[in-house]
Every structure is written in structure tokens, then in C-alpha cells.
Swiss-Prot record:
Pfam families: Peptidase_C1 (PF00112)
Family annotation (Gene3D superfamilies): Cysteine proteinases (3.90.70.10)
Cysteine pairings via disulfide bonds: C87-C114, C97-C140, C133-C176
Lineage, uppermost ranks: Eukaryota, Metamonada, Diplomonadida, Hexamitidae, Giardiinae
Organism: Giardia intestinalis
Places the protein is found: Vacuole
Family of this protein: Belongs to the peptidase C1 family.
Cellular component terms per the entry's GO annotation: vacuole
Keywords from the UniProt entry: Disulfide bond, Hydrolase, Protease, Signal, Thiol protease, Vacuole, Zymogen
Protein's name according to its UniProt entry: Cathepsin B-like CP3
Function: Thiol protease which is required for parasite excystation and invasion of the proximal small intestine of the human host.
SUPFAM superfamilies associated with the record: Cysteine proteinases
Gene Ontology molecular function: cysteine-type peptidase activity
Gene Ontology annotations of biological process type: proteolysis
Catalytic residues, chain numbering: C100, H244, N265
């Protein structure tokens, strides 16, 4: 019984601790560490539910065609939030479901459609439709970037207004909907005409961002990342916790000359820099430059 109670206490204990935070701070990382409001009191299992197994990050070089960009140099910096403020919706929260792969893919769909002028303002596309209907991926247990873009080119997705997100509270895939939540018929499904991969070529990634808009990427999450509050993240301490897919929206250089990528996360605005984070650029930090995929759209 005593062992059972100890195990139960460990199971329900907060995952982020002051002692671990102090250890990270003692290593003097270039970024600011703390216990984000988003994670206060959450257990390890609750935080782990936000991630997917690192096996989903394995790169299939044949799955998505290589992207090409013009030979002209990319601008020194680019921030989609500043250049196209009418195109980017608020930061959302995926809840207790490892659906980051769906959130980041449809975020990129919306961003890039608006960048191309197909949408005149920010439109939230439905991660729930992708989670429920994309049988090539694993719903709340994770997804492969090439696989979700295969789905988005063959099937597409609808708007979040039509099929709002539910898996964050249920933790389940749900049934692929045939009608909108209000009972009306599903409207036009928005498909990508193609998707290309700019991975492992930082200059090409920069040019693709500046000329086509945000891209979907993924990276390995270490335990110190959960303590991120602000600054340019670089892995400092801890073990692998899982994989995570995100929306890359820009790049720049800080006052100390450190190059970084700007990333939109899906853990709500109470994490990081109002829901965003920056991570070291040009060194494939945590695999962030490994798979970087952009979709293209015509209507």
C-alpha cells in the first residue's frame, strides 16, 4: 500500500519543479527560464500529452518534393506578424491532445493562403477536421508532416467555424464529420495544390518564408524547453521528452548577434513570448531545420 501511495503521489505531482528550474538557471542559458503559467500544476502525463513520439520526426526524403527558390538573397529579417498583421490569427491551444501536427499544418494553410491573397483576412482552418479525417496519421498520438500534407493535397480541410476543435478536451480522434457543427452542409474543402520541403537548407527556408509565408516544421523537445519563457532558445539541459510540430513564421537576429527562427506554438498565449518562441537559427537546433514544409494554393 505504501508503494502504491508513493507511486500515486509521483504520478500526480507537478512536472515542472523549482529545483529543476534553479538547476537550468545555474547553467546560464542565453534564454530566460521559468515555470510558464500554462504548465503550472500540470503532471508529467498532462504535459506529455502535448507532444508526440520522436519517431514521427523521422525524415522521409522521398515523401515530399524538394523546394527550390530563386538565387536572390533573402532579406536579413522577416516577421510575418509585422509584414502581414491582417493574416495571422491569435495563438490557440491544442489542449490535452498530441495534435500539434494538425494545428501547425492548418496554421500554415491559413497563413500562406492569406499571403497569396486568396484570403483577404486571417481565416482559422480546422485542425479538428484533419485530426478526425486524416487516417494516415494518429490523431492525438501524433502525425507525420509528409502524411498530413498528403492529406491536405488530396482532401483538404474546412474552416474552424464549420468544424470547431474538440479533441483537446476529449483526447480522442472523433468521427470524421459530414456536416458542419451547426448541421449545415460542409462548405468547400480547401486543398493545397502541392507541398514542398525546404529542410536542411537554412538560406532556402529564409527565402521561402519571405516569398511565400509561414512553413510547418517540427523539432525534438527536451525537458528544459518546458521552462522556456523568453529569449532565443538553445538546448541546455535534460532528456528527450518527445517531438513537436509548429508554425515557423519568420527569422531575425538579436542584439547580441544571435540568429533565430520565430515560431508560433499551439500551447496558448500563456506560454513563451505570448505563445511564440525563438530558437537558434542556422545550426539545425533540436532538428528545427530538418523538415520544413510549405503548401501552395490556387483557390
Amino acid at each position: 500500500m505504501k508503494l502504491f501511495l508513493l507511486a500515486a503521489a509521483a504520478f500526480s505531482a507537478p512536472a515542472l519543479t523549482v529545483s529543476e528550474l534553479n538547476h537550468i538557471k545555474s547553467l546560464n542559458p542565453r534564454w530566460k527560464a521559468g515555470i510558464p503559467k500554462r504548465f503550472e500544476g500540470l503532471t508529467k502525463d498532462e504535459i506529455s500529452s502535448l507532444l508526440m513520439p520522436v519517431s514521427f520526426l523521422k525524415r522521409d526524403r522521398a515523401a515530399v518534393p524538394r523546394g527550390t527558390v530563386s538565387a536572390t538573397q533573402a532579406p536579413d529579417s522577416f516577421d510575418f506578424r509585422e509584414e502581414y498583421p491582417h493574416c495571422i490569427p491569435e495563438v490557440v491551444d491544442q489542449g490535452g491532445c498530441g495534435s500539434c501536427w494538425a494545428f501547425s499544418s492548418v496554421a500554415s494553410v491559413g497563413d500562406r493562403r492569406c499571403f497569396a491573397g486568396l484570403d483577404k483576412k486571417a481565416v482559422k482552418y480546422s485542425p479538428q477536421y484533419v485530426v478526425s479525417c486524416d487516417r494516415g496519421d494518429m490523431a492525438c498520438d501524433g502525425g507525420w508532416l509528409p502524411s498530413v500534407w498528403r492529406f491536405l493535397t488530396k482532401t483538404g480541410t474546412t474552416t474552424d467555424e464549420c468544424v470547431p476543435y474538440q479533441s483537446g478536451s476529449t483526447g480522442a480522434r472523433g468521427t470524421c464529420p459530414t456536416k458542419c457543427a451547426d448541421g449545415s452542409d460542409l462548405p468547400h474543402l480547401y486543398k493545397a495544390t502541392k507541398a514542398v520541403d525546404y529542410g536542411l537548407d537554412a538560406p532556402a527556408i529564409m527565402k521561402a518564408l519571405a516569398t511565400g509565408g509561414p512553413l510547418q516544421t517540427a523539432f525534438t523537445v527536451y525537458s528544459d524547453f518546458m521552462y522556456y519563457e523568453s529569449g532565443v532558445y538553445q538546448h541546455t539541459y535534460g532528456r528527450v521528452e518527445g517531438g513537436h510540430a509548429v508554425d515557423m513564421v519568420g527569422y531575425g537576429t538579436d542584439d547580441d548577434g544571435v540568429d533565430y527562427w520565430i515560431i508560433k506554438n499551439s500551447w496558448g498565449p500563456d506560454w513563451g513570448e505570448d505563445g511564440y518562441f525563438r530558437i537558434i537559427r542556422m545550426t539545425n537546433e533540436c532538428g528545427i531545420e530538418e523538415q520544413v514544409i510549405g503548401g501552395f494554393f490556387e483557390n
